[in-house]
Amino acid sequence: MRKALVIVFLGMALIVSCVVAVGIGAVRLPPLTVVNVLLRGLGLQTGQTPSSQETAVVLYIRLPRVLAAVIVGGTLAICGAAMQGVFRNPLASPDVLGISAGASLGAVTAIASGLFALGVYFLPLLAVVGALIAATLIYAISSFRGRTSLLFVVLAGLAVSSLFNGLVSAVLLFSNNYEVSQFIFWTMGGLEGRMWKHLALPLPFLLVAVALLFLHLRELNLFALGEESAYSLGMHVERTKRILLVATAVATAMAISVGGPVGFVGLLVPHLFRLLIGPDHRSLLPASALGGALFLVLCDLLGRVVIPPFEIRVGIITALIGSPYFLFLVVRSQRKGFRAP
């Protein structure tokens, strides 16, 4: 009952937050006006006819940005919950394990090579390639005789992350000033200027990858029992790890291609809900999806209203919130006595 109430509350809070976020900007729109425009956009007739300016602001400027926050936040939180479940480690997340660094290398390659200027589809595609290469390296380094050491996965993730960040710096070294400034702006993580075309390609890939994660809820719960117990219950542990790692890499890359490398969402949100509603992934993944979406919508809204007319990029907000929490987790693990799985 408690889990259902948490999920219902998160869903309602997300809807309210999205309506408020769509209404706030240089031109303030009341919530009723926003709802009216959205209903008419769905083909439903309402009593009041919105102006063409209100319709354009809601449907073509603010709604894509808010939906981008929902998609990016929800996806990163789901991926974080899955990684924490697979590796039985509260510090596991796509950015900590190096998958985000691989996606970033693919993205900066698209920017530096000029492919991004030829079309918005090149950045997400190269981000996926980079994330898959990072995931493959991590799995190959940490595997021995068909088995994967959970401790070595984390260590390999840190090593691969450092390698890819170094390659990013090397690419920037040979780029012109415009490309460097463009990438630095992108690395802060932000949703400014997001339009429907930026969501067109990533969304189908995201849906497939996230669906794969939801189809493995039972396996994620079995990982909590330990790999030997999972083997004895008939689960193909290594094959399941590979599937989940690929799905996480694709979903993370697509999310990063939309909002940049927004950090700590995949670490902070699922860990909080694991404490709140327990480790059962049948409820943890939906709660993490809604919680991550709500968290990023509110962070983006906060960045817009703190010092108007200037905006603080959402990646800065999440870093300011997530970094202290990450340090708290590290200190708590040390005090409890960290034991490698």
Identify what each model region corresponds to.
Residues M1-P341:
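Alpha-helical transmembrane segments in inner-membrane proteins
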